[in-house]
């Protein structure tokens, strides 16, 4: 157990009742695992619409436990949100629910505006009313989990994004997240609602839906399918292991200041092609049943994503200095853990490779202009 995790166990004992939106999704489910493990006395209510990327089985470890409850529903449903806040006496919202895949946002932006902007607005309105009705308690928190993509794209020479970097989103996805960030910030400045925003870099780890880069490559290796790499493969991303992200969010809820924004990054800038080659080497080492070996032979360059941001990089010195958080898992260790998880959990991802997923995959990677 690292020092930050030890530190968390010593937080003053104030029981929290959390509403975790999108808790059946990738980051949300990992956060629920973290919170229920570290704070078993707290109550956790998950609200998730169970869209294609939400999977109730991600939360199987907690189903039936006294302090855990799952509710299927939409964050845009104001009466449902009101009912949950009042009935369950929620004091903390951890807001993960979002449409999050850039390629899908290019194919169909409407769902992104609806969930990410209107959904966040609905939660803010409901939580503001609830907070006021309870006498505006100091310990209430609205944590809005967002992305570094709101800052736009960097050249290889630019300094990393800080919390002061101006917003310049380039995709319908990042524009919708930027819109939601602005609403959250406005509710703090206008109404003093105790909101906090976090902007993270690319997450990876267990329970990530197969459309995302790292699980996509692992699964395609196992199926002997091409490993599609956009453009020239030189796009750079900063990779954050999801467990490290959850530790940071824990600290932000307990010690972060309302009205503040915290950037959360892994300090792991890697070119896409280098990442794919690292994954190929891990698959060759760890998987016994590869149809094609070496896996690197499957790498196929495909037409670049529309408006593909060249580089993301996060300066996470604020959260390091103010809250004492730094990432504990190196990209080498994190990738190994992740590959091992996908190899051991085929029964988790195989049902997700549905006809709809295949149609979407073909549309993105095989329809070359």
Model-derived segments and their meaning:
Residues 50, 202-205, 235-236, 305-306:
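Short histidine/acidic/glycine/proline-rich micro-motifs that form metal-
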Residues 56-59, 154-157, 208-211, 275-277, ...:
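Short aromatic-enriched loop/helix-cap "lid" or pocket-rim segments at secondary-structure transitions
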Residues 3-4, 10-11, 18, 31, ...:
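C-terminal substrate-binding subdomain of Rossmann-fold SDR/epimerase-dehydratase oxidoreductases
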